[in-house]
Amino acid sequence: MKTKRFWGFIKDPIFGYIHLTETEKKILDTLPLQRLRRIRQVAGSEYVYPSANHTRLEHSLGVMHLAGLLAENLPVNLQEDDIQSCRIAGLCHDVGHGPFSHVFEHILEKYYHQTHEDLTEWLIRESEISDVIRAEGFEPDRIGKLAVGKLKDREKPYLNQIIRSAVDSDKMDFLLRDSYHTGAEYGRVDIFRLIYTMDVLDNNLAVNLTALPTLEAFVIARVEAFRTIYFHRTGRAAQVMLARALEKAKEAGELEFKTVEDYLDLDDYTVWASLKKCPKCKHIVDALERRQLLKCCYERAFYVKDQLITSLLTDEGFRSNVAERIALKSNLNPEEVIIDVPSLPSVPYHLAQTRAMDIPLFSKTQDGRKIPRKVTDLSQIIEVLQGFMNIIRVYTKEKYREKVMTAAEEVLGRMPVSTEVSY
């Protein structure tokens, strides 16, 4: 920060020492932030990568750190309060996540018509975070909107993009952090070159053309991390089972919340205990505890540039119809067949959420003028990757695997050789 009035520091395995101001320390010690210690970052991935037990708390600290670096290194006239606001927003950007992170998103959308971003704003406005923010001279509503990329600031609209854009502090942190904790190694990208070459172009964050190879590496790393971590077929099996358990628990009257206090009581620990006691879903939790996971018996991957196909695959009615047709051919109850696609709310960090080709690029003339450049004109790699990668999978219990696979091939077509690839 321009005026370094740090309270102290925390040792982080990704960035070394992360400094905190007194304001950030006070916010960190509130219940909404401390609750993030009990919410895993990529719930379900630990069934594939045993060390993937890191939480939303350390991710939030990392986003705070990178948001501050990005803000203070932009060659524009940002005040200390602007930089501190970005850091606070980064620290608080995930407080609205439910138990098991993105796995809970379906419950929020289906039953509460909310997303975790909506709840992030709510908690920043209505919880004790609000009292701390206001006492420190900041406006909770402004911080809440900045944390989810909805701040309307005519003079500095690019502040939103520090937290939420195609190349933001959130994605930079989770790419490095999730790769580190899983051991998948795809996140070895020089994000600091991106940070130090960013500028503001027409009120948007933009990357200097000199950093194009790093930007390409970032986009490729995101694709590979998605395939090998966020949509790994075994990790998704665990997440699908968790999502089904949560659905059954909600139908049984569990997972209710009306107040901030109610919601803050929901974390991985308390909800897991509730699921174990719920007669409707106890058998699912028992299977998870024994790692008796659903089996993927069919998979087809494809790239499309038409988002209509992505929307079709996400449609619950479409997926239910496919599951029923497969179940009928298998002589099974439709409950035994699950269709999974990466654009579902429970899947973290789907590539279609932010498009790499939307990233502004610029080059500089000798007299310092910034010239806009189009990324897809300059990078064949990003041009190729601009199609949305979709994967449709069919899961069932191991004892039904063969007949469901046969039925799925009849309904959806034979599986390509690419399904033999391990991801």
What is the predicted role of each segment?
Residues 90-91:
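Elongated alpha-helical scaffolds
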Residues 1-85, 95-423:
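Histidine-centered, transition-metal-coordinating active-site segments
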